[in-house]
Amino acid sequence: MSDWDSVTRIGAKHRAGAAPRETVVRGKSALNAAQRQGLVIATEKKYATGNAAGKTAAMEGQHLTKVDRSDDIVKPKTVGLQVADAIKKRRNEEGYKMTQKELATKCNTTITVIQDFERGTAAPDQKVLSAMERVLNIKLRGSDIGKEKFPKKK
């Protein structure tokens, strides 16, 4: 057969049906249908989507992917005892004396979040940490944790 006899067809209607294409299944019924046909099914968790994910959310997604793919146990990140002690100490100092409830109200969060931070078991939340820094006037992030953010001038 020479090159003159062969016909080249281009377009979606003339595609050869070689292998089934990868598709995203949306719903239980489509998943069950694929299982009945004996197709290969792979599940992947999508951690961050589009513009909803900021810089910190992307890092969190990377951490979750690392946890998902590793076989050994990965400890979740916590604020630590140094931050917890700094919050407790400052909350009980004269001039800043307040209850956990009052601190939670001023930081626009719940009492349980404040309790977790004071225990040192809370996951580092930048929004809550910045609010606490503002209310308590101490640094809770960086190198000098517990130091005054804006020291009084002499």
Curated annotation (Swiss-Prot):
Ranges where the HTH cro/C1-type domain occurs: 87-143
Keywords: Activator, DNA-binding, Transcription, Transcription regulation
Entries under InterPro entries matching the protein: Cro/C1-type_HTH, Lambda_DNA-bd_dom_sf, MBF1_N
Function: Transcriptional coactivator that stimulates GCN4-dependent transcriptional activity by bridging the DNA-binding region of GCN4 and TBP (SPT15), thereby recruiting TBP to GCN4-bound promoters. Involved in induction of the ribosome quality control (RQC) pathway; a pathway that degrades nascent peptide chains during problematic translation. Required to prevent stalled ribosomes from frameshifting.
SMART domains noted in UniProt: HTH_XRE
DNA-binding region (UniProt annotation): 100-119
Alphabetical list of CDD domains matching this protein: HTH_XRE
A Pfam family annotated for this UniProt entry: HTH_3
Species of origin: Aspergillus fumigatus (strain ATCC MYA-4609 / CBS 101355 / FGSC A1100 / Af293)
Family statement drawn from the similarity comment of this UniProt entry: Belongs to the MBF1 family.
Gene Ontology CC: nucleus
Protein name: Multiprotein-bridging factor 1
Keyword Transcription (UniProt): yes
Source organism superkingdom: Eukaryota
Region named Disordered: 1-23
